[in-house]
């Protein structure tokens, strides 16, 4: 009986697939297995296409492995026990798997499918590995693909990589909607690659080490740099807060967007085609948004405002820690007065000086003018700071003047206050000349990563806040059509070339018949002396009457300290 079974086994052996020998083969074994399946199909049907061959060979890996039968032998069904019958009852059913209808148990299908999942995960891992190699190769080459000496520094290459990644992953957020899962997955994966560099930026720290004999000695050990330990986790949390905020708008259906130029947008009273012509127009129901959605939008705006303020604070601190390049210092004039101009210099040297009132009197009707004013004050701050440092060597210093130390410190503090107000009032403004110069010539990789990461989060938060304010503004204009007509009239006046040169002041609710004349410097000084009323009330009134400003829901201007202490949205929607 034993010999008969051995002979039967030898009879079946040539028909079995010798897996052990295939595993021992070299790389050609993979081609051997494919030749067995592909060639057999092509011999049977020479005209078969590649797609059919791939489908049949791919499904061969999930076919049930059955014992080989003899030529004349018929398959004998095995009688299952009662326990097996009860266990398999309800489990076995006809399942269509890759075009084949066979009777499999669900466990068999799951095992086969998990095998395919493992293969797909492996190929995804290989693809991600190649992407990582490509990205870090560009970083090591300094963005110079020729491999020459024209590449940028590692700090600037990482900064540009983070900036370009944010631009390609998020793009320009034109609608208040959730970001797709593919974009979020790509963003989290690739930003993790770039931030992993900070794990290897260390600093020496003294620690006490106890020897075997009980003696103690102080040794230097390495740990991650302190500023990176505090800033990187904070920025990651802000990143998640922004993505979660956008995800919450996934299922909303009360407002929608229409493309500019469509028939529905032409019938709208919105001025989006004028001040934000590149953005789709927000459409809300005729009766406006529901109270639930309004409260939700306000809460999300407060959350995004917190993210914006935190990212701005981190970015400002990092830029302050960066060294000022010598090329920027060489381009500065010798006096701060020459950088500001005579009129601005006289205004900031007044004994009764108010930074908020100063900004209200300046022409901030365009982003170019705001950026120009910011560049002037940053240059003057650098000049005065260098003079304060070099005050002890007046005879040999080219920066020496007749101004006293207290006067320079006072001017430097006033200029710094104005810069803080500009940054808080216009968070979406472009980078100044000093900031660009610092980023370009910075050599600290840790500071470069924190600065670029905080900058893109600041820009993203500002954009999301602007989209939320667009929806709230559309709801306000829908409920109050007269306000929309007033806004259209004001926008047309500001676009008129005849009225651009003169400062045009008008109330949004009560437009005066005559325009106020231009206020000269002497009138401003006399007004400051003779007026006994609080200057805050006039500041609030003039803020509402500024033609270049957008329609504001509040009639009270928030100061810089109030903006930092609360979550009120800054008036950042002008240039977004």
Curated annotation (Swiss-Prot):
Keywords: Guanine-nucleotide releasing factor. The PRONE (plant-specific Rop nucleotide exchanger) domain is responsible for the GEF activity. Guanine-nucleotide exchange factor (GEF) that acts as an activator of Rop (Rho of plants) GTPases by promoting the exchange of GDP for GTP. This is Rop guanine nucleotide exchange factor 13. Residues 557-576 are annotated as: Disordered. Specifically expressed in mature flowers. Residues 119-485 form the PRONE domain. PANTHER family: ROP GUANINE NUCLEOTIDE EXCHANGE FACTOR 1, ROP GUANINE NUCLEOTIDE EXCHANGE FACTOR 13. GO terms for cellular component: plasma membrane. Interacts with PRK6. The keyword Cytoplasm does not apply. One of its GO terms (molecular function) is guanyl-nucleotide exchange factor activity. It comes from Arabidopsis thaliana. Residues 557-570 have a biased composition (Polar residues). It holds the Pfam family PRONE. InterPro entries: PRONE_dom, RopGEF.
């Amino acid at each position: 009986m034993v010999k008969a079974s051995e002979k039967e086994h030898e009879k079946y052996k040539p028909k079995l697939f010798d897996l052990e020998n295939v595993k021992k083969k070299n790389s050609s074994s993979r081609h051997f297995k494919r030749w067995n399946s592909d060639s057999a199909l092509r011999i049977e049907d020479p005209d078969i296409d590649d797609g059919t061959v791939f489908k049949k060979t791919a499904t061969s890996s999930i076919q049930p492995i059955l014992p080989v039968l003899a030529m004349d032998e018929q398959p004998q069904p095995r009688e299952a026990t009662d326990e097996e019958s009860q266990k398999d009852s309800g489990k076995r059913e006809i399942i269509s798997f890759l075009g084949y209808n066979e009777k499999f148990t669900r466990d068999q299908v799951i095992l086969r499918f998990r095998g395919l999942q493992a293969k797909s995960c492996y190929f995804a891992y290989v693809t991600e590995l190649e992407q990582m190699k490509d990205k870090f190769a560009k970083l090591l080459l300094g963005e110079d693909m020729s491999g020459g000496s024209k590449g940028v520094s590692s700090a600037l290459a990482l900064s540009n990589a983070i900036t370009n990644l944010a631009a390609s992953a998020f793009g320009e957020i034109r609608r208040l909607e959730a970001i797709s899962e593919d974009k979020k997955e790509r963003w989290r994966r690739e930003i993790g690659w770039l931030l992993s560099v900070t794990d290897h930026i260390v600093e020496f720290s003294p620690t006490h080490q106890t020897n075997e004999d009980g003696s103690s000695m102080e040794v230097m050990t390495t740990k991650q740099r302190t500023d990176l330990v505090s800033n990187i986790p904070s920025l990651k949390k802000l990143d998640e807060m922004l993505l979660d905020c956008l995800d919450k708008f996934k299922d909303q259906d009360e407002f929608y967007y229409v493309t500019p130029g469509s028939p529905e947008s032409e019938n709208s009273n919105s001025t989006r085609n004028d001040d934000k012509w590149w953005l789709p127009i927000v459409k809300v129901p005729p009766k406006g948004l529901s109270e639930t959605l309004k409260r939700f939008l306000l809460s999300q705006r407060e959350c995004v405002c917190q993210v914006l303020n935190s990212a701005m604070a981190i970015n400002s601190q990092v830029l302050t820690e960066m060294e000022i390049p010598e090329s920027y210092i060489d381009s500065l004039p010798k006096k701060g007065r020459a950088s500001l101009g005579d009129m601005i210099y006289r205004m900031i040297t007044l004994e009764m000086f108010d930074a908020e009132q100063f900004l209200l009197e300046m022409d901030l009707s365009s982003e170019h003018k705001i950026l120009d004013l910011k560049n002037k004050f940053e240059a003057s701050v650098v000049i005065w700071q260098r003079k304060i440092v070099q005050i002890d060597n007046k005879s040999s210093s080219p920066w020496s003047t007749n101004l006293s130390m207290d006067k320079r410190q006072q001017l430097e503090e006033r200029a710094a206050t104005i810069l803080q107000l500009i940054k808080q009032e216009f968070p979406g403004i472009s980078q100044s000349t000093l900031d660009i110069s610092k980023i370009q010539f910075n050599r600290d990789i840790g500071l470069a990563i924190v600065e670029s990461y905080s900058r893109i989060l600041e820009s993203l938060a500002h954009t999301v806040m602007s989209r939320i304010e667009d929806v709230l503004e559309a709801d306000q204009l829908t409920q109050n059509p007269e306000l929309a007509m007033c806004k259209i009239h004001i926008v047309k006046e500001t676009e008129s070339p005849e009225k651009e040169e003169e400062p045009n002041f008008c109330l949004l609710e009560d437009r005066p018949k005559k325009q106020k004349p231009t206020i000269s410097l002497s009138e401003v000084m006399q007004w400051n002396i003779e007026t006994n009323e609080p200057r805050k009330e006039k500041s609030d009134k003039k803020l509402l009457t500024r033609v270049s400003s957008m329609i504001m829901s509040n009639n009270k201007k928030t100061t810089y300290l109030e903006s930092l202490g609360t979550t009120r949205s800054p008036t950042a929607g002008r240039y977004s």
